[in-house]
Structures are given as structure tokens and as C-alpha cells.
């Protein structure tokens, strides 16, 4: 499910996403009763940093007032943002980068790493019914399968003490760090894996938890 211009959707419509994102199911209630259906899906959402779209732009000036920026961001509730695993800020691409012939990691190489990581996860979770990948790992099993180095534990503890993350964010950070480690071919979660996972929670800090 791709939602472009996320803040332009009604608050009511966005809040309905909270249950399926959390539980993988949706409950429909009517006067005659209610029914629950499976609702596993991948949510991808995009939005501008502000109404005019230029907040933080290196060359264009933002025309929004601070109150307008805050009002725009408040269209996305903290509980919904808390249920989104990855927050990625896309900066404008410089001309030199577009014109450069130097490429990064190829799509084929990335695909090979993802296939290997998914195979590793299927093997790891054979004893857990209904769990085939890190995203499905229940909270009760996180500490068992997401073992951290002391340095990684220190980073995670410091982030929670400074930023006041929720228990839900804790679970999601560990699952993302587990995936980063799998892509890196590491069984232990080290400082680099936790640091990368924490970088993907940047909107929690900018938007605040509402």
C-alpha cells in the first residue's frame, strides 16, 4: 500500500491503519456484530517536510512559518508513526551525483544479499510457528534472537534514556537491527547495526510523539 502525500489523507483514515500495522488483522464492526480479517501488508508512505516542500532544502527557502510546519506535521499522529519501522529522509540529489558515472552497489548485489538474509531468517525461526522473517518475530522472542554486543546495548540504552522511545519502538528497532545484522552476515547485533536502526527513527525526534 503506497500513500503519497501522507498528511493530505484524513486523520480518521490514517488512524484506521494502526490495528493492521500492529496486529496484521483488521476488525470491521457493524450493528449486527463484528468480524476480523487478516490484513498483512507493507505500507510505504511519502510526504514533504512541510507544506511548501522546501524545509531543510540546501538552496531553496522554505516559506512556511514555524506554526505552519508544526500544524502540517501534526496531521500524522505519534501512535501511527510509532508503527512505521523505517523513516528515511530523502535529500535533494546534487547535479554532480546525477552526472557521475560512479555507481554504488548494484541492484543484483542487493538482491543477492536480501535472498541470503531471508533464507537465514527462515532457518533461524523454524521452531517458531508462523514466523518466517524478522518482521514477524514476537516481542517475547526478541531478546533470544536479537543478542547484542555490550557496545550495542549501551547505544540502545542511551538512545532510550535521551529520546524516550516507547516499548513498541524498542521492539521495532531491535527487529530492524536484526535485519541489518543479517544483511551484514552477523549473528550478533553490534554497535553499527544498532546505530543504523536508530537512524531510521529520525521522524520520532522531529515530529515528537503525540
Question: Language-model segments: which ranges?
Answer:
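Basic, amphipathic alpha-helical bundle interface domains used for macromolecular binding and assembly
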Residues: 6, 11-210
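Walker B beta-strand of ABC/ABC-like P-loop ATPase nucleotide-binding domains
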Residues: 1-5
Amino acid at each position: 500500500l503506497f500513500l503519497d502525500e501522507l498528511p493530505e489523507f484524513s486523520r480518521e483514515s490514517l488512524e484506521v491503519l494502526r490495528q493492521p500495522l500492529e496486529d496484521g488483522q483488521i476488525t470491521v464492526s457493524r450493528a449486527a456484530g463484528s468480524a476480523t480479517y487478516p490484513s498483512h501488508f507493507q505500507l510505504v508512505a511519502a510526504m514533504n517536510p512541510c507544506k511548501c516542500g522546501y524545509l531543510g532544502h540546501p538552496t531553496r527557502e522554505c516559506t512556511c512559518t514555524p506554526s505552519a510546519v508544526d500544524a502540517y506535521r501534526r496531521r500524522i499522529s505519534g501512535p501511527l508513526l510509532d508503527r512505521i519501522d523505517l523513516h528515511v529522509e530523502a535529500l535533494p540529489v546534487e547535479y554532480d551525483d546525477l552526472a557521475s558515472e560512479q555507481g554504488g552497489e548494484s541492484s543484483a548485489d542487493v538482491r543477492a544479499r536480501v535472498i541470503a538474509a531471508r533464507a537465514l531468517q527462515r532457518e533461524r525461526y523454524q521452531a517458531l510457528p508462523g514466523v518466517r522473517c524478522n518482521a514477524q518475530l514476537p516481542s517475547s522472542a526478541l531478546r533470544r534472537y536479537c543478542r547484542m554486543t555490550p557496545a550495542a546495548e549501551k547505544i540502545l540504552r542511551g538512545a532510550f534514556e535521551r529520546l524516550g522511545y516507547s516499548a513498541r519502538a524498542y521492539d521495532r528497532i531491535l527487529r530492524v537491527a536484526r535485519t541489518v545484522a543479517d544483511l551484514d552476515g552477523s549473528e550478533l547485533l553490534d554497535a553499527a547495526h544498532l546505530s543504523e536502526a536508530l537512524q531510521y527513527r529520525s521522524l520520532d525526534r522531529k515530529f515528537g510523539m503525540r
